[in-house]
């Protein structure tokens, strides 16, 4: 669909430019930001708007305050961190709308930046309430969506607001996300390899269905692999399995076989006698998982097998860890795959969420082509869905 970007606008000087960013970043108990990738990702768009002389109004959510004001979820730490990164003052608004906020916006000078308070402090945000969108817009002349990670949500600051502000465009982060996704799924250099992990098959079912029409190889790891293994007749001990999806898992593998898609599952795993970091654990083949033990990581032979599948890959998409990587004892498989993806002579795209964290924890984030900022949004794109936040930018359907 045709989308305009912020650098295609002729003049931003002195205009009130509303930029929807995603500063939903992790913080420690004292409110210190522990990981600021989403803030740094929005810097190019914010800097561009500043350089063009716009009056920059930023909006984001943080956490799940359930439609009520809660200081724990204030945007103050994000504004402070952004100030440090930009090397200039970012003012924190008193709220996200209202008379005081209107005065704060009207008092802004060219090139100044104002951070609105958490848009989820009001139920109208998640209800996609047009009235709330009107209040948020506050006379802004240009709307910029640079929040890919929330673009699968039809929320007021993502969707309804685009019917209020006259000029609607996307930012540079959004352009990067869409460009790399198109490179991976619409026009991939082959072979195209998809690596899927995580706990549940149910969360990736639609993705798997879609991938069956796109990929050359599929690699399945993480907890979801054991639903597939059980569907093949393996005894998987106490490993978590979605029994209701066993027939579906079998159908997916049959479909892959008929289409000539290589389908890889773990051949060994690390099993433990409890879901605990200190649990007794050992490596075993998938045929010999003891009764009562649960698999919490792929084993070294599986890591080698999965690494081999990437040797001739030209495009790699990875979403979902290979094990419970948050626990050191069960992180080796995920880190081995992270190293393999980082070393591949291919366009490598990491699908946000836990996979993003795993790649950073493995220390290879600088060696992959692109790390998506969106977990759920990335998955919905893989499923072939049109994201509400992206559809709202389509210039063909704009008023």
From Swiss-Prot:
Coiled coil: none annotated. One of its GO terms (molecular function) is ATP binding. Substrate binds at residues 22-24, 38, 61-64, 120, 153. It comes from the Bacteria. It catalyses: (2R)-3-phosphoglycerate + ATP = (2R)-3-phospho-glyceroyl phosphate + ADP. CDD domains: Phosphoglycerate_kinase (cd00318). The keyword DNA-binding does not apply. Keywords: ATP-binding, Cytoplasm, Glycolysis, Kinase, Nucleotide-binding, Transferase. The keyword Coiled coil does not apply. Pathway: Carbohydrate degradation; glycolysis; pyruvate from D-glyceraldehyde 3-phosphate: step 2/5. GO terms for cellular component: cytosol. Its EC number is 2.7.2.3. Pfam families: PGK (PF00162). One of its GO terms (biological process) is glycolytic process. It is found in: Cytoplasm. ATP binds at residues 204, 326, 352-355. Belongs to the phosphoglycerate kinase family. PANTHER family: PHOSPHOGLYCERATE KINASE, PHOSPHOGLYCERATE KINASE 1, CHLOROPLASTIC-RELATED. Monomer. This is Phosphoglycerate kinase. It comes from Pelobacter propionicus (strain DSM 2379 / NBRC 103807 / OttBd1). The gene is pgk.
């Amino acid at each position: 669909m045709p989308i305009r970007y912020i650098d295609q606008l002729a003049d931003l000087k002195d205009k009130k430019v509303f930029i929807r960013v995603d500063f939903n970043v992790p913080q420690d108990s004292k409110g210190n930001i522990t990981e600021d990738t989403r803030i740094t990702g929005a810097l190019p768009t914010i800097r561009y708007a500043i350089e063009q002389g716009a009056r920059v109004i930023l909006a984001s959510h943080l956490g799940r305050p359930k439609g009520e004001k809660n200081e724990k979820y204030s945007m103050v730490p994000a504004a402070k961190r952004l100030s440090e990164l930009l090397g200039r003052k970012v003012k924190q608004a008193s709220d996200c709308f209202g008379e005081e906020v209107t005065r704060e916006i009207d008092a802004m000078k060219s090139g100044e930046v104002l951070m609105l308070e958490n848009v989820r402090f009001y139920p109208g945000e998640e209800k996609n309430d047009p009235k709330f969108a009107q209040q948020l817009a506050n006379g802004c002349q240009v709307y910029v969506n640079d929040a890919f990670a929330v673009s699968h949500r039809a929320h007021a600051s993502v969707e309804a607001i685009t019917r209020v502000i006259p000029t609607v465009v996307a930012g540079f982060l959004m352009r990067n996300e869409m460009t790399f996704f198109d490179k991976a799924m619409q026009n991939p250099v082959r072979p195209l390899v998809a690596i899927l992990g995580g706990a549940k098959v149910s969360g990736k079912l639609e993705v798997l269905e879609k991938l069956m029409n796109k990929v050359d190889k599929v690699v399945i790891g993480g907890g979801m692999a054991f639903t597939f293994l059980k569907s093949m007749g393996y005894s998987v001990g106490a490993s978590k399995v979605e029994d209701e999806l066993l027939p579906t898992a079998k159908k997916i593998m049959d479909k892959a076989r008929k289409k000539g898609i290589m389908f890889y599952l773990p051949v060994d795993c690390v099993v433990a006698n409890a879901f605990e970091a200190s649990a007794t654990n050992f490596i075993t083949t998938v045929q010999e998982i003891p009764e009562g033990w649960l698999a919490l990581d792929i084993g070294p032979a599986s890591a080698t097998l999965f690494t081999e599948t990437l040797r001739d890959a030209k495009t790699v998409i990875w979403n979902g860890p290979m094990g419970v990587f948050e626990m050191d004892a069960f992180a080796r498989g995920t880190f081995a795959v992270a190293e393999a993806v980082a070393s591949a002579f291919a366009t490598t795209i990491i699908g946000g969420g836990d996979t993003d964290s795993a790649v950073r924890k493995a220390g290879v984030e600088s060696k992959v082509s692109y790390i998506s900022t969106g977990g759920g949004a990335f998955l919905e794109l893989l499923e072939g869905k049109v994201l509400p936040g992206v559809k709202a930018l389509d210039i063909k359907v704009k008023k």
